[in-house]
Amino acid sequence: MKFFATTTKGLEDVLAAELIALGTRDVVPGNGGVNFSGTFKDGYKACLWLRTANRVLQPIASFPCPSEEALYEGVYALNWDELMTSQMTLAVGAKLRDSEITHSHYAALKTKDAIVDKIRDRTGQRPNVDAKDPDLQINMHLARNQCTISLDLAGTGLHKRGYRRDPTIAPLKETLAAGLVALTGWDQASPFVDPMCGSGSLPLEAAQLASNHAAGLLSPDFGFQRWPDFNAGLWKNLLEEAETTKRELPANLIFGSDRDKRSVDLARRNADSAGIGAKIRWSYNDFTKLEAPASQGTLICNPPYGERLGNEEELTAFYRKIGDTFKQNWKGWTAWVFTGNLALAKQVGLKASRRIVLYNGPIECRLLKYDLY
């Protein structure tokens, strides 16, 4: 059985390493995701454990699609009555590029029409559409007039960990945060500090990693749990295994701080919701006044970079303060800055030993490494 796990552009190799660690086969990174093979058990495990995957798709068909008629016929030809009942709800998402069909909303509607027509012709009843919470989420991908139809195992984005309460103005998506933590190479033994933690995505993802807490363990449910062939016994065993393999998170290992008290309070609530609130050290403090908790460790921050927060003049001065504070207060540490503004990054005034290209949504970003001696 073949699968495709999508991810943030730039995290493909990180996701591939996760899939290899899970024991899946034929792991091949691609553009924006990773192909892999396995059983339904592997698909379930992928939804439960993967930290950097946005979605886990199961391709069920691929066919030439030079026209809307070809799209309808290709989708209608599939055995949809074996994949869903007329009582189930569905939703279709479409992504298109370099094809004769150019409107994604129209393509999604055409795909939906073919599916419900096939179910009606086989059963006499049409299933309903539920765009917000469907029983079966279907992905239609059209590239260069070749259409691939996939089932979305989770049914929703895997960044929805189940612990987040009210998001702050510009939250860092959990899957991207997990990727940033992985890219730092943090050893999970020395201190991990985020001095601009916002609602806590980076410390929380670091804590889940260090405690071997499955990324999807708090998620209320996944789409595949509503499918006709769902194996409830297998899923129960996987959940029990995930619970028993969790580790105790050491105290004084992970630190989150922010100068905005509302953000820190929200981060605490998110951590409490995740069951690890007592183990993360939170503080309400300005970064320039924060003291290093040890002689060495990993610091990572996602300072505002002008797309949604702050203004250019204030941010220029702020980035200069970041560099000054690194030099004065964090000698012996490895520091990482994630930003979508390269001009601002230069204001740090330190030479980066590594630059990693990533995307935060449509924004091209850099993860910059600074070795502080």
Language-model features: locations:
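Short amphipathic alpha-helix with an adjacent loop that forms part of the alpha/beta core around
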Residues: 81-83, 289-296
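Conserved S-adenosyl-L-methionine
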Residues: 172-292, 308, 312-316
